[in-house]
A protein has these predicted regions:
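Active-site SXXK
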Residues: 11, 28-53, 119-123, 188-191, ...
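Active-site helix/loop module of the DD-peptidase/beta-lactamase fold
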Residues: 28, 47-98, 128-178
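Flexible, glycine-rich surface segments
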Residues: 160-223
């Protein structure tokens, strides 16, 4: 099978392998995109566009409640009253329980895409870049991250909206339209280097350093409510501070990971980044 691997240490590419694939081809990041979502949330809070990670999302994107029975991705998936209290922190930490009746916000770790879509739409709406009446008309969350993150770190990635093949009554304009990034391994390495340096790029603070520190440890919601084997996720990152996900690796390591073997593994104590991205 084709594969691409890049190792960077001390700010330089140490090794790069490209087997039966073009190193310049951009690959879909799938859920690895969610770590960039996290960074953009940190930026939005720093800029005062969003007040706090603990703000109710309905105050910014009330449309999230406009999904009745028969309008969700499946028959039993709909917005229910407790969803009104969902916070930004719960969305990025996959503990929101969005459209999952029986899951109270902040109590259950359930890795899902639709809650992340609510996150990106709510942030983009706060910047006046997304509307459910015409989802593809505005600049969108992807363009926002180009402005705030990609361009400052001299990246070259692109993005597009992605949707699952759902039934015709599904309100995808509310909970669909996933912002999917396409990156080369070197783009992925740029993201990793930004995170390793706590959001700083050549002296410019692109993402708040405190946010990176905060997002790359297992969230308190998971620590307080889930068994130890689930103590693996922070705010948009897979985290090893509890030693559960990679027991033999340094506790300060963390990663962005997505389907198709898209991975950006970061280890600050080793000043090391490892990227895997099949072509």
């Amino acid at each position: 099978k084709p594969y691409r691997i890049l190792i960077a240490r001390h700010g330089k590419i140490v090794s790069e392998w490209n087997f039966r694939t073009d190193p310049l081809e951009k690959a879909k990041q799938a859920s690895a995109s969610k770590s960039t979502f996290s960074c953009m949330l940190g930026v939005a809070i720093e800029e005062g566009v969003i007040g706090s990670e603990n703000d109710r999302v309905t105050d910014y994107y009330p449309e999230l409640m406009d999904v009745e029975r028969g309008q969700g991705p499946k028959e039993d998936r709909l917005a229910f009253p407790e969803n009104e209290g969902i916070t930004f922190r719960q969305l990025i930490g996959n503990t929101s329980g969005y459209m999952k009746p029986g899951e109270a916000p902040g109590k259950v770790f359930n890795y899902q895409t639709f809650g992340m879509n609510i996150l990106t739409h709510s942030i983009a709406s706060a910047y006046r870049l997304y509307t459910t009446s015409d989802p593809e008309r505005g600049a969108g969350f992807g363009t926002l991250t180009n402005w705030k993150i990609r361009n400052p770190i001299e990246g070259s990635w692109s993005w597009e909206y992605e949707n699952f093949d759902l039934h015709p009554d599904a309100r995808t304009e509310v909970f669909g339209f996933f912002t999917g990034y396409q990156m080369t391994p070197r783009d992925m390495a740029r993201c990793g280097w930004l995170w390793l340096n706590r959001g700083n790029w050549n002296g410019t603070q692109v993402v708040p350093s405190k946010w990176i520190e905060h997002a790359t440890i297992v969230s308190t919601e998971i620590l307080e409510n889930e068994p130890e084997d689930k103590h693996v996720y922070g705010l948009g990152f897979w985290c090893n501070d509890q030693g559960r996900i990679w027991p033999d690796l340094p506790r300060d390591s963390y990663a962005a990971s997505g389907a198709g073997n898209q991975h950006i593994w970061v280890c600050p104590s080793l000043d090391l980044i490892v990227v895997q991205s099949p072509g």
